[in-house]
A protein has these predicted regions:
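Short internal beta-strands
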Residues: 50-62, 175-177
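N-terminal beta-loop-helix "entrance" segment that forms/cooperates
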Residues: 59-80, 184-189
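Walker A (P-loop) phosphate-binding motif
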Residues: 135-183
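Phosphate-bearing ligand-interacting subdomains
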Residues: 69-133
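Glycine-rich adenosine-cofactor-binding loop
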Residues: 23-46
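N-terminal amphipathic/basic-hydrophobic helices that include classical n-h-c signal peptides
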Residues: 1-14
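ATP-dependent carboxylate-amine ligase catalytic core
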Residues: 165-240
Length: 240
């Protein structure tokens, strides 16, 4: 039998010990519609030891108040997973009896990160950062990663230059871009763009076109989307 739920009183606040079911840890994932979905897919989607009760969304406007759809969330989440505004974090931890919060986005200062950690722990939950060994995907083909510490640092022109150099060596090259998931997440699970008409078919935003069109103009192909593993497996068949 499961042990009884323990009820504590901390000052004027009652805290429920939600570990009565040790086989199912309640998780909330903090994100910005990118790494958060990937962390869910590789760490939690098919793991019955955890119950992801929601995502929070930051940085990008109008990406909250919707669902991570059932088709992407997997068999354990037939109703999908709600995406909330990050400003509701404290309330969600308390009302959803969250035991573990996984911080899953970048482009924040150390000070901002630790502020979030303090808020989470004050609400009673653990604060997690998922490391590379548990979340990186093994690739069968060589990968060149173009990274930067901040948005707008110039990754895109560097990526296009690298693609140009590799294509000049006679290699088949595909650019894989972090998604800009403003639309239908299910339709954006795996996206492949090889011509301007593909952008029209996908109803790409101006921001997406600004990113993808220069690759297409130099004869390249671009992959994007929410399910990174499915994207990787398709790219491995298309590129050297």
């Amino acid at each position: 039998d499961a042990p009884p739920v323990a009820l504590f009183t901390t000052g004027e606040r009652k805290v429920v010990d939600n570990r009565a079911k040790p086989h199912e840890i309640r998780v909330l994932i903090m994100g910005a519609a990118g790494r958060d979905f990937h962390n869910f897919n590789v760490l939690f989607r098919d793991n019955p030891d955890y119950r992801v009760v929601g995502f929070t969304a930051a940085q990008i406007p109008n990406i909250d108040d919707r669902l991570y759809p059932p088709a992407l969330a997997g068999a354990l989440y037939p109703s999908g997973i709600p995406i909330h505004a990050e400003q509701d974090l404290d309330r969600l931890i308390r009302t959803q009896h969250v035991e573990r919060v996984v911080f899953s986005y970048s482009d924040v200062s150390h000070e901002a990160l630790m502020h979030q950690a303090s808020l989470v722990m004050a609400a009673g939950a653990d604060f997690w950062l998922a490391g590379p060994q548990s979340t990186m995907l093994p690739a069968k083909k060589p990968v060149v990663s173009i990274c930067a510490t901040r948005t707008g640092a110039g990754k895109s022109p560097v990526a296009r230059r690298v693609v140009s150099i590799l294509k000049g060596e006679g290699l088949r090259v595909a650019a894989v871009r972090h998604p800009m998931p403003y639309g239908n997440l299910e339709r954006q699970a795996v996206q492949r763009f090889a011509a301007l008409e593909d952008l029209d078919a996908a109803s790409c935003t101006i921001e997406e076109r600004e990113e993808y069109e220069p690759h297409l103009a130099q004869g390249g192909m671009v992959y994007a989307g929410v399910d990174y593993e499915r994207i990787l497996r398709e790219v491995e068949d298309q590129a050297d």
